[in-house]
UniProtKB/Swiss-Prot annotation:
Record-annotated Guanylate kinase-like domain positions: 12-190
One Pfam family in the UniProt entry: Guanylate_kin
Amino acids binding ATP: A19, P20, S21, G22, A23, G24, K25, S26
Lineage: Bacteria, Pseudomonadati, Pseudomonadota, Alphaproteobacteria, Acetobacterales
Protein name per UniProt: Guanylate kinase
Listed SMART domains: GuKc (SM00072)
Subcellular localization(s) per the UniProt record: Cytoplasm
Family annotation (InterPro entries): GK/Ca_channel_bsu, Guanylate_kin-like_dom, Guanylate_kinase, Guanylate_kinase_CS, P-loop_NTPase
Biological source species: Granulibacter bethesdensis (strain ATCC BAA-1260 / CGDNIH1)
Reported function: Essential for recycling GMP and indirectly, cGMP.
UniProt record similarity statement: Belongs to the guanylate kinase family.
Catalysed reactions listed for this entry: GMP + ATP = GDP + ADP
Listed EC numbers: 2.7.4.8
MF term (GO), any: guanylate kinase activity
HAMAP family assigned: Guanylate_kinase
Length: 213
């Protein structure tokens, strides 16, 4: 008689959704987090001062530059970067704990952070790049935010640099219609979750049948 399949034992994964500013990444990731209890947002460590309403361990882990540098030197950060004079990074411990418990972690990083995560956690990172339908459409979205022309020009230049790395991601989603883009990202996440290599229970289950992977 066939042994029943266990319902637990899957290793978690790291989901990176990268995109140029204005492509809709925040809208997509907010929707995923709201509907999926198995997906949690990675909490970064930063050297910037807390803003009003921000809580330690909820929005960020706030550290001095000296503390941050020590964490990086000791290998406690999966990835890190310096942005506008402040340091940001991903603490290793909480992510590894989540993965071992079968939870999936969503990261708000750029293409450089994606590569650092892949190096630190080979086999655990799924990368999706979100594109706008066109650069003209992206410019229109940025204009709709009410940004000043010089800010829009800066963001468009940064977008071109970011888009140049789209080929380094295994998945790409074009955000023409937001609900469809959300559904595509959801489908990719589901497929990644069901990969054979993530099913920690499988070897034991097959062993009970006298089989092996």
């Amino acid at each position: 008689m066939m042994r029943p399949l266990p319902e637990t034992g899957r290793r978690g994964l790291c989901l990176v959704v990268a995109a140029p500013s204005g492509a809709g990444k925040s809208s997509i990731t907010r929707a995923l987090l709201a509907e999926d209890p198995g997906l949690r947002l990675s909490v970064s460590v930063t050297t910037r001062a807390p803003r009003a309403g921000e809580q330690e361990g909820v929005h960020y882990y706030f550290r001095t530059q000296e503390e941050f540098d020590a964490m990086a030197a000791e290998g406690q950060l999966l990835e890190y970067a310096r942005v506008f004079g402040r340091s940001y990074g991903t603490p290793r411990g909480p992510v590894q704990k989540a993965l071992s418990e079968g939870s999936d972690v969503l990261f708000d990083v750029d293409w450089q952070g994606y590569h650092q995560l892949r190096s630190a956690l080979p086999g655990d990172v799924v990368g999706i790049f979100v594109l706008p339908p066109s650069l003209d459409d992206l410019a229109s979205r940025l204009e709709g935010r009410g940004d000043a022309p010089d800010i829009i020009a800066q963001r468009m230049a940064a977008a071109r640099d970011e888009i140049a790395h789209v080929g380094e991601f295994p998945y790409v989603v074009v955000n023409t219609h937001l609900p469809e883009a959300i559904d595509q990202v959801r489908t990719i996440l589901h497929a990644a979750r069901t990969e054979t290599k993530r099913q920690g229970w499988l070897r034991h289950w097959l062993g009970g049948l006298g089989l092996s992977e």
